[in-house]
């Protein structure tokens, strides 16, 4: 509506920065946005669904506000045991789309039988939270509580999770808390670094934080407002969408401090673990840090050395037998003498990921092998992946021996390569 039609919110008495409004609304579907004094219009920073820049909600017969009225079917589902996980990382668009089309949650549902037949019991989704525009890998995150509208509706995402659960497949969400784009309503609602509690200058480093935001805004994880906001978002995904866990991106750039365990990475991972100890809480913390995983509520970290030593082997840079046994077969990171991970379930090991192209491509490009030779040798590396200690993860299309790391000329999955 027009500015003149806007409803004025009230400031809570005795509470800092709390504004509220109470409305008598009948059951139905609604859209709303915030109108700031400077004329800026914003969706809710805790939106579940955003359509054309506005928050969309459903008011139920009991007065509750949700993104939809989805009815769950997989109520008997039990999460796979941690030591049985075989994780499959995929990007909704690239995995499901063909040609010049765009992939959606429904397209992923159509391929769940393929994943189940391949022995997959956990899917790690690259970011599916709201980002600017219609095509992205999702690491330019905008609203981490909202489903990316180009992939489908909240109800369709719930159907994906529900259907996966009926097949015994867990869903792990990739979440990006290190940074946000400047169009995020969490920033736009107070675009002043000195006044907005959720952000800081990227050069103002917190304990154990490395600078790196890829040109986006740096989230301040040592502010209790931030920790509270992150936990509220996590609870949305756990409570309303029934996700089984999270993979947290770029946590080396977040910061942590054992003397301040309620803040930083330790703060919101411990809140999540305390809320539901059965959740998978995994981190991409590179360079990897076994000590951090072993002394926190984090379930597991990406095992960087596993990939690196296999890549060395592909390039003909052969490691010593001790290095291979320590860092590939064993649970060491980067060194044969440091303290390794305590348990195999504390590492996520992989040959390929969204950041690392396929070893088949490496063998063709760097070792001069034919595609058939590379695929045959790739089976040797896959044997190591599935027989060494740790939780194996494969990248979309890897099970079919795709050379290209999945992408065709349109950036989509090329199932014809199968």
Would you name each region that the model predicts?
Residues 1-5:
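Beta-strand-rich binding/interaction modules
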Residues 8, 14-89, 94-100, 107:
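The feature marks proteins involved in alpha-glucan
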Residues 20-21, 75, 95, 251-256, ...:
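Active-site rim elements
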Residues 32, 36-75, 167, 185-212, ...:
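Core domains of carbohydrate- and sulfate-ester-processing enzymes
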Residues 35, 43-46, 98-102, 127, ...:
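Short, solvent-exposed loop/turn and secondary-structure capping segments
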Residues 51-54, 73-82, 91-242, 251-276, ...:
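Substrate-binding/active-site clefts of carbohydrate-active enzymes
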Residues 54-59, 242, 258, 262-407:
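Conserved alpha/beta catalytic core and glycan-binding cleft of carbohydrate-active enzymes
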Residues 86-90, 123-125, 171-173, 246, ...:
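Hydrophobic faces of well-ordered beta-strands that scaffold small-molecule active sites
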């Amino acid at each position: 509506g027009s500015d003149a039609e806007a409803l004025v919110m009230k400031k809570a008495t005795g509470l800092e920065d709390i504004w509220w409004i109470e409305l008598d609304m009948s059951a139905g579907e609604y859209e709303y946005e915030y109108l700031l004094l400077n004329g800026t219009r914003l969706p809710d920073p805790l939106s579940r669904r955003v359509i054309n820049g506005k928050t969309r909600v459903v008011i139920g017969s009991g007065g509750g506000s949700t993104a939809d009225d989805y009815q769950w079917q997989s109520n008997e589902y039990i999460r796979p045991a941690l030591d049985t996980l075989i994780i499959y990382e995929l990007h909704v668009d690239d995995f499901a789309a063909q040609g010049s089309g765009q992939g959606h949650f429904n397209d992923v549902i159509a391929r769940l039988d393929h994943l189940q037949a391949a022995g997959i019991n956990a899917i790690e989704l690259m970011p599916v939270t709201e980002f600017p525009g219609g095509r992205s890998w999702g690491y330019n995150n905008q609203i981490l509580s909202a489903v990316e509208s180009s992939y489908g509706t909240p109800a369709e995402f719930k159907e994906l999770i529900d259907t996966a659960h009926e097949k015994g497949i867990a869903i792990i969400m990739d979440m990006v808390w290190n940074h946000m784009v400047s169009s995020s309503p969490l920033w736009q609602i107070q675009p002043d670094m000195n006044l907005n509690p959720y952000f800081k200058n990227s050069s103002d480093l917190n304990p154990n934080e490395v600078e790196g935001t890829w040109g986006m805004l740096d989230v301040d994880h040592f502010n209790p407002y931030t920790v509270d906001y992150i936990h509220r978002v996590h609870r949305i995904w756990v409570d309303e969408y029934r996700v089984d866990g999270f993979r947290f991106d770029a946590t080396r750039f977040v910061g942590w401090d054992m003397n301040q365990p309620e803040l930083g990475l330790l703060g919101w991972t411990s809140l999540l673990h305390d809320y539901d100890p059965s959740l998978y809480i995994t981190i991409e913390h590179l360079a990897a840090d076994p000590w951090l995983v072993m002394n926190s509520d984090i379930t597991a970290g990406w095992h960087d050395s596993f990939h690196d030593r296999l890549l060395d082997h592909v390039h003909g840079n052969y490691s010593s037998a001790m290095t291979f046994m320590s860092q590939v077969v064993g649970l060491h990171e980067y060194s044969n003498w440091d303290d390794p991970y305590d348990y195999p379930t504390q590492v996520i090991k992989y040959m390929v990921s969204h950041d690392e192209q396929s070893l088949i491509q490496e063998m063709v490009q760097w070792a001069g092998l034919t595609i058939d030779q590379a695929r045959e040798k790739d089976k040797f590396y896959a044997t190591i992946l599935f027989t060494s200690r740790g939780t194996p993860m494969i990248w979309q299309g890897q099970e079919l021996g795709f050379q290209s790391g999945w992408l065709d000329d349109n950036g989509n999955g090329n199932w014809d390569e199968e």
